[in-house]
C-alpha cells in the first residue's frame, strides 16, 4: 500500500513535490488555499486576498536553462528571462504534462498538522483542513510543507523614529501590484533588494520623483554577461573549483575592480558600506534611472515628520506622499504546534535545510525555505527528490538525538559569537545541489564521465551547471538529460535569432590555439589535484570564506 503524503501549497515547490511523490510511488494530496496553482507566480491586480504575489512588471532574474525542472526544459522559443505570465505558462505546461492537477484540492486551508499519539512508531500526522466552511480530518504518513518564505510581511515600523507622525500612505511591497495609483507622487522606497530596485524603476516612469533608501548599498548585476549571454550561464563547475582554491583577498579585489569597471558604484550611491557583507541585485534599468535623475539614492532613514523624511546624512526630502517598505518577510507555520513551529522557522538548524531535528521519525519536510545564488525552483525540486526517498526509507538521515545536539551546539556558538549566524546567507547553488544529489545518488562523477563520454563531460564541467546534470545517473535518471545538456546553448540562442544576419569571418587568434591545446592538459592536471584529499583538506582549512562561484567571471580581469 502506497504511503500517503500531504503536500501543503501548490506553488513551484508544491508542484515538484507532487511529481516527486509520484516518481517514488507515493500517494500525494496537495492542499492549496487559493483557486489556482503557481503560488506567488499567479498574478492578481489587487492584494485583497492577503496573498504574496508578483507585481506586474516582474521579470525573472535567473535564465530559463538554469531555472527549469530538471527533466522538463523550457520550450526553445521561450525568452531567456521572462515575464511572470510566461513563467506561469511554463508551470502550467509542467503540471499538465505530468498530470499533477488532479492531486490538488483548491480553496482548501490547512488548519493544523499534529503528530498522532503513536508517532514514534508510525511517523504519522493528523491533518485538519477546511474547504468552503467544511472541515475535514485525515491521516498522512508524511507531510511536505511547500508554503515558501513569503507569507508574512516583515514591517519593522518601530525601527523608524517618527513613523507614527507621518501622514502619507505607508505600505509593504507585498501590497504592491501595479503603479497606476502612484502617478505624480513623491515616493520613498525603503530597502534595496531585487524587489526594491524593481519597484523604484517601475514607479520612476510615472511618479513625480522616487527616492531609494539603503543602509548598506549593493552590487548591481545585469542579466547579460560580456558577450550578451545570460549571466547565470557562467555558473560552472570549473569556476566553482577555482573559487575554492584562489585566495579570498584576490577574489574580493578582482570582484570590486570588475564591478566598478562596469559601473562605478560609488558615483551612483550604490557602493557597499564599509564592514558590510557584499550583496547583489539584478537590475538592468536602475543605473539608467539614477543617471537620468528619475531615481535618487539616499542613505538610511533617521526620522519622519508629518510629510518629510530626514536621512542619516542630514539631508531632508519634503512633501513625501508614499513610503513603500521592501523589508522582506517572516517565516510562518501557523498550522504547527510549539516547539515544532519555532524550530521550523530556524533555517540554520534544519538538517540540510529540510528536516526538523527534533522528530523521532523523518516524516516532515520543509521544502523551499532556502536562499540560493541560483534558482530556488531547482533547489526545491532536489529537496523534494531527496525528501521523498527519505520517506520511503531509501535514504536515511542521522537520529534526532544527534541532530538536536548539533542544533543546540550551533545555537550556543552563535549566541557566544564564536560562529556567525548564516541563516540569512545565500547558499552556493552548485555546492548545495551536489550535497543533496550525493544523498540521492544522482550526482554525476566528472572523472568517470570524462572516460565514458568526453564531449558530455566537457560541457558538464566547463559549461553551465544546468539542472539536467542531476538526471544523468542514479535514481530519477532521465534519458533526455544528455541531449538537453548538449543543446542548452541552442535553446539559449533560439529566441534571439529573429533576424537573419550574415556571419562575419573571425580570424583565428593565438588564444584559440591555447584554448584548444592547453585546456585538455590543464583539465587533467586539475582533476588530479581535485582528487587529492590532502589538497582539499588544505584548501578547506585555509580558505573558509568564499564568494559564490558564478560571480567569478565578473571578478576576473579581462583583456579589452
Curated annotation (Swiss-Prot):
Cofactor: FAD
Transmembrane segments: 510-530
Highest taxon listed in the record's lineage: Eukaryota
InterPro entries named among the record's database cross-references: FAD/NAD-bd_sf, Flavin_mOase, Flavin_mOase-like, Flavin_mOase_4, FMO-like
Keywords assigned by UniProt, alphabetized: Endoplasmic reticulum, FAD, Flavoprotein, Membrane, Microsome, Monooxygenase, NADP, Oxidoreductase, Transmembrane, Transmembrane helix
Catalytic activity: N,N-dimethylaniline + NADPH + O2 + H(+) = N,N-dimethylaniline N-oxide + NADP(+) + H2O
Enzyme class: oxidoreductase
Similarity-based family: Belongs to the FMO family.
Official protein name in the record: Dimethylaniline monooxygenase [N-oxide-forming] 4
Native source species: Mus musculus
